[in-house]
Amino acid sequence: MVKKVNKSEVRIKKHNRIRNRFSGTPTRPRLAVFRSNNHMYAQIIDDTVGNTLVSASTLEKGVKAELEKTNDVAAAAMLGTVIAKKALEKGITTVVFDRGGFIYQGKVQALAEAAREAGLNF
């Protein structure tokens, strides 16, 4: 009998494999992305200390007010520009992109490309 595959477990396994390859440092922190069915979240993390340096999500009032929907590609692109602006204000210019086990397409790709256009290097 074929066992049904749980997609979230597969994504978590992929994310753990990715996390074993790299981690955020003070000079080059990690840009971690998480997307749920309704919202997207992005954090810039220094893994040596375990601190979140910058965070943004589609739940924030400023972001949510400008968006028609919080779970589409346009929302992801706006989140990318917001996280990049916050990072540049804190003096963070280069990051390591952690897609969180999600496939690099659609919302994740839109967030990454918008962050690059706003000035983050990765």
Swiss-Prot record:
One GO term of the biological process aspect: translation
An annotated GO cellular component: cytoplasm
InterPro entries: Ribosomal_uL18_bac-type, Ribosomal_uL18_bac/euk
Keyword Ribosomal protein: yes
GO molecular function, one term: 5S rRNA binding
Pfam family, one: Ribosomal_L18p
CDD domains in the cross-refs: Ribosomal_L18_L5e
UniProt keyword annotations, A-Z: Ribonucleoprotein, Ribosomal protein, RNA-binding, rRNA-binding
Subunit structure: Part of the 50S ribosomal subunit; part of the 5S rRNA/L5/L18/L25 subcomplex. Contacts the 5S and 23S rRNAs.
PANTHER family according to UniProt: 39S RIBOSOMAL PROTEIN L18, MITOCHONDRIAL (PTHR12899), LARGE RIBOSOMAL SUBUNIT PROTEIN UL18M (PTHR12899:SF3)
Function: This is one of the proteins that bind and probably mediate the attachment of the 5S RNA into the large ribosomal subunit, where it forms part of the central protuberance.
Family: Belongs to the universal ribosomal protein uL18 family.
Identification of the protein by name: Large ribosomal subunit protein uL18
